[in-house]
Every structure is written in C-alpha cells, then in structure tokens.
Amino acid sequence: MPHMANTQTNDFSKGSVAGNILRLALPMTVAQLINVLYSVVDRMYIGRLPDAAGNALTGLGLTFPILSIVTAFANLFGMGGSPLFSIQRGKGDRDRAQVILGNTFALLVGTGVALTVVLLVLKRPLLYAFGASDATYPYADGYLTIYLLGSVFVMISLGMNQFINAQGFGRTGMLTVLIGAVTNILLDPVFIFVLGMGVQGAALATILSQFLSAVWAVSFLRGKKALIRLEWGSMRLQPKLVWQIVSLGFSSFVMAITNSIVQVACNSTLQSFGGDLYVGVMTIINSVREVVSTPINGVTSAAQPVMGFNYGAQEYRRVRSGIVFTTIVCVVYTTAVWLLLFLFPRFFIGLFTGEEALREAAVPSMHIYFFGFFMMSLQMAGQSAAVALGRSKQAVFFSLFRKVIIVTPLTLLLPHLFGLGVNGVFLAEPISNFIGGGACYITMLLTIWREMNRKEKAKLSGEAPQ
C-alpha cells in the first residue's frame, strides 16, 4: 500500500460550512493576493523606469496573453486534479487520491517543459500579433524570454498548491506563495534598478521566486505533515485518469486561455484606435482588476474543496449552504469594490504610473470597465459550484459563453459603432458581466441547486439518491 504520512482527516462534513470555507479562504486569499504581487509589483517598478516607463509598461502588458497560456495549463491540471482529489478524500479512498496527485504532478512538469520550447520559438510573431510595435517589442521580448525559461516552476507552484489547500492546509498554501512573493519584492528593485537590468531583471526576480515556491510545495507534499503524500510511484500516467483531470480542469483552462484571447483582442483593437497609450491603459486596468478580484477568487477556490468533500460524503444540504455563503460574500464584496473604484480611480491608477497622459486616459476607461462589477461574482459563484461537483461541461460552457461569445466579438465590434472608439473596448466588459454572470448563476440554480434538493429529499426518505 502507498505510504500515507498522516492520519488526520480535515473532515469538511463537520462544523460550520461557512467556517470551513473561511478557514481556507482567509489564507488562500492572502496567498492569491501575494501571488498577484508577483506580476503587479513588476508593473509598479517598471512603470517608474526612467525615460521609457510608458513603453516598458505597455511592453510588459503585451506579454499577458502568453503568461495566461502558462497559467491556463497550470489550471488545467491543478484545478482539474484537486476537485477529483477532494471527492476521493470525501469517499475515503486515499489510494486513489494519491494517484490523482501523482498524475497531476507529472502532467504539470511535462507540459511545462513543452510550453517553454514552443513559446520561445513562437514569441516574436505572437507578440507582434498581440499588438506590439517596434517601440514596445524589445521590452516585451526581454521580459518574456527569461520568464519562459522558468515556466515549469510557475506551473509546479500553482498546480501543486491546489493539493495543499485541498487537504485543508490553507496556511501552508499561503506560505507557498508568500515565500516566493517576498523574494520577488526584495529582488525586483535590486535587479531592475541597482543592476540596471530593467524588464529582464523583473522577469529574473519572478522566476527565481517561483522556483522557491515550487520547491516548498513539493517538499511539503513529500513530507510527513501531508495527509496524502506525493510519491514517485504514483506518477505513472493513467490515460483514463488523465482524461478525467483534463475534462474537469478544462473549465479553468478555458477561463485562463480565454483571458488570453480577450487580451489579444483588446490590445490589437486598442493599438488600432488609440495606439500604445491605450494599450498601457489596459495594462493598468488589468493590474487593478487582478488585485481587487483576488478575494472572490480566494472564497470561490476555498469553497470548492469544501463543497466537493460534502458532495462525496452525500451531505447535500451542506453543499447548498456553501453555495449560498459563497454568493453572499462575493456579491457584497464586489459591490463595495465597484463603489471604491468609481469614487477613487486616481488612487488605484497612481499605483502603476506617474505619467499624466496615462492617468488622464485611464480614469474614464476605468469607470466604464468596472461598471456593474458585482455581476462578475455571480459567474464566479456559479462556476465554482459546477467545478466543485465535477460538472465540467457546464463550467466550460459558461467560460466560453462570456469571454468568447460575448466579450471578444463586442471588443472587436463596439469601437466601430456610434463613434465609441476605444471606449467600446472597455464597454464590452460590463455588458459581458451582466449577460454572462446572470445566465451562469440562473443555470446553476436550475440544475445543481435543484439536484441538491432532490438528493437531500431522497436521502431523508431512505431512498438511494439518483
């Protein structure tokens, strides 16, 4: 029998559902916020480079679609394997959970190496296709080349941390990111300014930091404190299991890869209608969105192992409680954020640039982009429930529906209508949040919520749940 290092269970079917979610969400939110700082701190420093801050910041923004591809594959395996892992823990099948962990690790490493090679070969045509100009390409290329050389560490730290959190070790998961982020914050000014490496220094600091995070995550999962350990013998790929991991993680993959598609559409359209200035504006807005979205990501990510465990344990009432709690927290938070961004846009913009032209252009754009921000939380809550319960098709559909069917076409179309120009690009986001968020949440209520009610009634009456 594979070695299991810890007999503790972290049983999510006991105690308050809200308490279980918050116990994971607080450290996970801090961890994700710190993780966002990897790239956001880079942008804060790069936005203050002497003489070329605008072009450097815009060039860094042009790399986002490719960085999103790396994140997408980390999500594909990490967020595909961890819900399966949680369900098997809920069922008490520790051996199967260990195999899921090992297969996921193997997929992360193999794919990370392959991505490094492919993206290094294709980086030049991709960056120009994504909206680079001759003025901004050198900055984008300098950052991306170094980042890609360490992308396997990014994938391991992101993907394996899902399994640390899924075992209930939220604080340890937070430390995975904290170790790297603190290193990044310390190294950034040294590499960027003291050593004069500019954007290349920012990339090198990020990759060295992700390396430390990856080492920490793997060391914990190999150690005695893990409930279910990462064993080399569990890494032999099982085709059927790989398909299950990919199928369930595909929604998270689609969410990240469609981020890349949307970013490409935005950057190329903004380049046509507003030039490098508005590509820089979008870089700032994306940076603000990443920071303020972190708490919702933390809550919905924390809710997934709790809901998945209770679903596996046939505690359907507790699954419903998890959905309600997640929804309330996310809607209240995003409404508050919307008001803050509307009232104090210059404060948030000023974190990333001191250039007056960028700041003046960014204020009205931010007002448009974040209008009705609270509707995004409904999409997050609905998809979180679908992923937690293994409903990959439903989660994938709504990822595609909002970003590919609504956002991307509107981004390309609206600038040509009613003289909207660049404002049309920013207007596509709130429209998609209202339509996509509403449709996703209503569908969740009509499918998952109703099924939980039916299974709970069958359980109470002594029938086998269908």
Question: Predicted regions: what is each one?
Answer:
Residues 1-25, 85-152, 194-249, 307-372, ...:
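Short alpha-helical transmembrane segments in multi-pass integral membrane proteins
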Residues 23-42, 146, 180, 209-213, ...:
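Transmembrane helical elements of multi-pass membrane transporters/channels
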Residues 28, 32, 44, 83, ...:
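Transmembrane alpha-helix boundary and packing residues in multipass membrane permease domains
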Residues 33, 37-58, 127-134, 190-197, ...:
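Helix-terminus/linker motif at the lipid-water interface of multi-pass membrane proteins
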